């Protein structure tokens, strides 16, 4: 056997061995394509598609810390020291398109903490904390069901951009409800709502009494039977501003209340608003007309002084003679982080002194600084 024959034989053996190994080899499957989270811009900034679905999700909220001093401008009592409170609000929003319209949900969970020095001796304070499901509703097109704020409060718009905005309360806040909002293409909108009644998430806490004049603890503003509270409203909005009105029927006390509000954009930086209200019950111990007496009026302005700083002013007065004035400057230190120093003044009338059970009340000055990070 010569060298040439030996080399040819060795090569043939190697080819045969390689073929046998290839026949025994396991073929690995191709890796699946990675599905990255997609941005969803159909419902605003911050939404993304939940993988494997056409539902868009947004996680947002805020963290805030408040420091208060001076008098409590709601009750008129002297704080005797600093009051501190903190809140973490976690919000989750979803949205998707269906054959019946846009399907949305919104939830907000609040974690609260507060520490107070408001004892008469000013020496010992009190602490409290708690967690609450503030909002949880489903919306399909214009139909909304769940826990939300009353249309009597939101349809006309909130009061001014101040922290102590409801020293003279303009109505209840959180409630269970079924509502329908019609939005036209020409700036007009209308709403009708059936509501369970509020839980007094506002500024004034009423004192309910039985037929013998004894105080009833733990009662809120909820309905006491099958008949719901009813709210209806109309609004027109344009580039110049808006005008809106609402009327509400309180099924518990069988009385009604109404509000009308106008907003005007003087310039891109300067806007003003005015709101008037009337209640047939003439008492704050109710779900909607929580001001004193028959009527109340609120007004305010906002001036965007710079890109970072805004000045806000609000004044209010009711039929019982209470006057409340608040002013602040909201300064955005960096995007998403705002510091707001605010000062408030309240003048109490004789009727409010009797309502609050404190004949020594006269006026109250209070201040607050809010630190808030929104995301």
UniProtKB/Swiss-Prot annotation:
Outcome following mutation: residue 134 to E: In strain: 686, De12, Fr7, Fr11, Pt1, Thomsen and Wf21
Gene Ontology CC annotations of this record: cell outer membrane; pore complex
Pfam families from the UniProt entry: Porin_2 (PF02530)
Mutation effect (residue 172 to S): In strain: 686, De12, Fr7, Fr11, Pt1, Thomsen and Wf21
Superkingdom assignment: Bacteria
Keywords in alphabetical order: Cell outer membrane, Ion transport, Membrane, Porin, Signal, Transmembrane, Transmembrane beta strand, Transport
GO MF annotations, alphabetized: porin activity
Membrane topology term: Multi-pass membrane protein
Phenotype for residue 258 to A: In strain: 686, De12, Fr7, Fr11, Pt1, Thomsen and Wf21
Gene Ontology annotations of biological process type: monoatomic ion transport
Outcome recorded upon mutating residue 153 to H: In strain: 686, De12, Fr7, Fr11, Pt1, Thomsen and Wf21
First and last residue of the signal peptide: 1-22
Disulfide bonds: none
Subcellular localization(s) per the UniProt record: Cell outer membrane
SUPFAM superfamilies reported for this sequence: Porins
Family membership: Belongs to the alphaproteobacteria porin family.
Further remark: The pore formed by Omp2a is larger than the one formed by Omp2b. Omp2b pores have optimal permeability to allow growth and protection against harmful compounds. The larger pore formed by Omp2a may be advantageous for intracellular growth, when the bacterium is competing with the host cell for nutrients whose concentration is particularly low within the phagosome.
Quaternary structure note: Homotrimer.
Note on domains (UniProt): Consists of 16-stranded beta-barrel sheets, with large surface-exposed loops, that form a transmembrane pore at the center of each barrel. The pore is partially ocluded by a peptide loop that folds into the pore lumen.
Function according to Swiss-Prot or TrEMBL: Forms passive diffusion pores that allow small molecular weight hydrophilic materials across the outer membrane.
Protein name: Porin Omp2b
Lineage: Bacteria, Pseudomonadati, Pseudomonadota, Alphaproteobacteria, Hyphomicrobiales
Gene name, Swiss-Prot/TrEMBL: omp2b
């Amino acid at each position: 056997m010569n060298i040439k024959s030996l080399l040819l034989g060795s090569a043939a053996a190697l080819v045969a061995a390689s073929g046998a190994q290839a026949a025994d080899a396991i073929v690995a499957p191709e890796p699946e394509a990675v599905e990255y989270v997609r941005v969803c811009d159909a419902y605003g900034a911050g939404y993304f598609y939940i993988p494997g679905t056409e539902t868009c999700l947004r996680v947002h909220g805020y963290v805030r810390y408040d420091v208060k001093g001076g008098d409590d401008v709601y009750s008129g009592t002297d704080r005797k020291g600093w009051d501190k409170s903190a809140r973490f609000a976690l919000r989750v929003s979803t949205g998707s398109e269906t054959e019946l319209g846009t399907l949305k949900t919104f939830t907000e969970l609040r974690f609260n903490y507060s520490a107070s020095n408001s004892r008469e001796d000013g020496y010992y304070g009190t602490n409290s904390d708690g967690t609450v499901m503030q909002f949880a509703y489903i919306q399909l097109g214009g139909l909304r069901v769940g826990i939300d704020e009353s249309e009597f409060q939101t349809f006309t718009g909130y009061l001014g951009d101040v922290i102590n905005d409801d020293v003279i309360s303009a109505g209840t806040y959180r409630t269970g409800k079924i509502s329908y909002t019609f939005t036209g293409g020409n700036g007009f909108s209308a709403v009708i709502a059936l509501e369970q009644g509020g839980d007094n998430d506002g500024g004034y806490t009423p004192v309910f009494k039985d037929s013998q004049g004894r105080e009833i603890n733990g009662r809120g503003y909820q309905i006491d039977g099958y008949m719901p509270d009813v709210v209806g409203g109309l609004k027109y909005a344009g580039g110049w501003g808006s005008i809106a009105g609402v009327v509400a029927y309180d099924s518990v006390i069988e009385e009604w209340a109404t509000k009308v509000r106008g907003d005007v954009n003087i310039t891109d930086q300067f806007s003003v608003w005015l709101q008037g209200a009337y209640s047939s019950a003439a008492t704050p111990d109710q779900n909607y007309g929580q001001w004193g007496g028959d009527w109340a009026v609120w007004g305010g302005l906002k001036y965007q002084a710079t890109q970072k700083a805004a000045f806000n002013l609000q004044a209010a007065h009711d039929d019982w003679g209470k006057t409340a004035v608040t002013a602040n400057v909201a300064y955005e230190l960096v995007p998403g982080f705002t510091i707001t120093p605010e000062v408030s003044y309240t003048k109490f009338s004789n009727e409010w002194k009797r309502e609050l059970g404190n004949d020594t009340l006269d006026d109250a000055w209070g201040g607050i600084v809010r630190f808030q990070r929104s995301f």
